[in-house]
């Protein structure tokens, strides 16, 4: 490979470094005057990309709420009812209340929640909804959580409620000894749709913007700058997909840099918790518009490498494939398609 000169006549996609070289140093301008040794070293650094990961994720389907409910009703509950009489369902806050509510409704049983006394560190059961009939308190309570990972929570529940049933819809093999029942063994790694966006993974995650935090911009709006800026300022958000509790590494978007103020104001208005906003260079607009999927996909992949991000949440499958091709180390999450790879 020839490192004796810069091979790019202008800012754009560089096939030597396999990244977008803009006019901002140390990219395209830097390369004009760099020594062969500097270019070769930069190539090695660029190719190295992300070499460290928290945990290698396989490809798979994102586990959806509908999967959680189906497993609770059709796999877990029949196992329990074959051997026990149940007089109530106790949902373990917070996400354990999701399957618990559906199971209680399906069986027409009272729904309870679990509360903890902070002063005494003891647990008690609180009634949330009665059944339509007159259920006698005969049999056992079914304590239900969505997932069990280490088994510590279920172990504590067994100590507090030794005469009742402790269960989880999904459980790791490690947690099984502390459960009476589980619907399905689910060893990691995996992604759960109902908690991913505020899970510990988010600190190592970068996000696409349009199509993830809000609907994609309609084509007719893109062609009219007044409509476009109004859209950026006022588009409704997908609140359930926004990192709020844990700060995301970055938001990386194909929007042009000149719309930064509008974009930052919208992100602030919607309480998105992120560290950096990376936007597409204004001077590469024509190149972007000729082949948006490839150019923006590569630009995102390049910045994901620089951020050392483990996950990238992308709205478009076609762009996601480009990102994965350019950066094999990142796990690309596609919530609109229900998959990650």
Where are these regions (language model features)?
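Cysteine-centered metal-binding/redox modules
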Residues: 1-50
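PRPP-associated nucleotide enzymes
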Residues: 30-233, 258, 265, 269
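Short active-site oxyanion
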Residues: 85-89, 140-141, 248-251, 308-311
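Conserved Lys-Pro-Asp/Glu-containing loop-to-beta segment of HAD-superfamily phosphomonoesterases
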Residues: 139-145, 294-317
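Acidic, divalent-metal-coordinating active-site segment for phosphoryl/phosphodiester hydrolysis
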Residues: 148-158, 299, 304, 316-327
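Acidic, Mg2+-coordinating phosphoryl-transfer loop and its flanking beta/alpha structural elements
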Residues: 164-173, 309-341
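Substrate-recognition element of Asp-dependent hydrolases with the DxDx(T/V) motif
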Residues: 241-264, 278-280
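Donor nucleotide-activated moiety binding/catalytic core segment of transferases
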Residues: 273-308
